[in-house]
A protein has these predicted regions:
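N-terminal secretory signal peptides that target proteins for export/translocation
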Residues: 1-11
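Short, surface-exposed beta-strand/loop micro-motifs that present aromatic residues
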Residues: 85-88, 148
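Extracytoplasmic
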Residues: 42, 81-83, 93-95, 134
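Coil-to-beta-strand transition motifs
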Residues: 91-96, 156
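A low-complexity, Ser/Thr/Gly/Pro-enriched, surface-exposed linker/loop concept
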Residues: 71-82
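Bacterial N-terminal signal peptides
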Residues: 15-26
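Non-cytosolic coordination micro-motifs
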Residues: 3-5, 32-71, 99-179
Length: 179
């Protein structure tokens, strides 16, 4: 009976070690924090509301079941913080998601403070905050999920405010709305 070469054992060992370190370097998602004040929508617009072009919103993308809108006037802001873009997404004509993009460490810190003031503080227990080149933060309510992803190396952030009920209907084929 032929004997396996010893290199197979070392290859497995080294592969396991490399995989372990790659997983650590990717950053571990922070646990979702229960949302203290679920807004059941975004800035006064309830999830599931009929949404169309108005004086305030213009359609920028139509993907059949999903339409994407942006604000017509001014620089978008999340609370007091100016952001690069804010897109409002519908599923079958019903308001379902907002995608916010921003850049810069100072902007990230302001947004994180603002979101914590709205939805509750993050769990600062060791091991609960993401480390590595990508940080994830999440608040989960009964009707709303808020997920923030921030890349330290590029200082780019993206936030999703989503209706839990309408999330399943969303088409994630559009790169503008994919996490």
């Amino acid at each position: 009976m032929p004997r396996r070469p010893r290199t197979t054992h070392w290859v497995r060992y080294i592969s396991s070690v490399v995989l372990f370190f790659l997983l650590i370097l990717q950053g571990v998602p922070a646990s979702a924090v229960p949302m203290q004040n679920d807004p059941n929508g975004f800035e006064g617009i309830p999830w599931g509301a009929t949404f169309s072009e108005t004086d305030s919103f213009m359609k920028v993308q139509d993907a059949g079941q999903s339409q994407t809108y942006e604000l017509k006037a001014g620089t978008p802001s999340l609370g007091p913080v100016k952001v690069d873009s804010m897109r409002f997404v519908t599923s079958e004509g019903k308001f379902a998601r907002v995608t916010v993009r921003y850049q810069g460490k100072a902007t990230h810190d302001q947004i994180l403070a603002y979101l914590q003031s709205l939805f509750g503080p993050l769990d600062r227990t060791p091991g609960q905050i993401a480390s590595g080149p990508v940080k994830f933060f999440s608040w989960t309510g009964l009707e709303t999920d808020v997920k923030l992803r921030y890349e330290i190396g590029t200082n780019l952030g993206i936030i999703f405010f989503e209706s839990q009920q309408l999330r399943r209907k969303m088409t994630d084929s559009s790169s503008d709305t994919v996490f």
